[in-house]
Amino acid sequence: MSSIYTLSYDKETNQIIRTVKEIFSKNINNNKELSVLIDKYFIPQELEKKSNAEVSTPFKLRQEMLDKMPIEFWTTPKKVFEPCSGKGGFVIDIIDRFMIGLKEKIPDEKERYKIIVEDCLYFSDINPTNIFICKLLIDPYNKYNLHYNEGDTLDLVIKDKWNIDEFDAVIGNPPYNSSGNTGTGNTIWQNFTKKSLNKWLKSNGYLVFVHPPGWRKPNTEKGKYY
């Protein structure tokens, strides 16, 4: 089946690639600057918004969400899944949290970074362009064994894909529905929530999502899902 998504290697894209590689080469732990760069340059295109309800999650909101997790979470290697990675905002933020949290346990920056991206981080997206960008941001020189899925995350079986059973945390901003218009299309955010709670997440794990508030209210229709 042909994809509606294509990779466009135009002059602007090549400049972004050069910029990302330059930032990365200057400081392997410069993840906050990379994260801000995502907000500035990697904005979902109209096709991505309409076909897959893709939206950017602002840097400030991402930080507020991650701040709600215990600081201690990041002080030991754990498995974290971003199921709708988009252009990589949460992915880079997760790396940054681990880089800070694991500093005492793993003082060497390069060793720490390798452990994080190879043992702690997992991500998925339906859009191959997004996967390309995430891989570029994380590993511009193809040095690491990354764990990613290119395809519909709701069809993903993590045991088959990565030979793991559960994650310590699932973090992201799942699409609200199957189109970019909240008034049309089938709502799918609850499918990401259900699968996170029932299939992906440890019983004592953390689910950190942007979502409508209804599913937390048992007396609402959405709340009946749970």
Say what each PLM segment does:
Residues 1-226:
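SAM-dependent methyltransferase catalytic region
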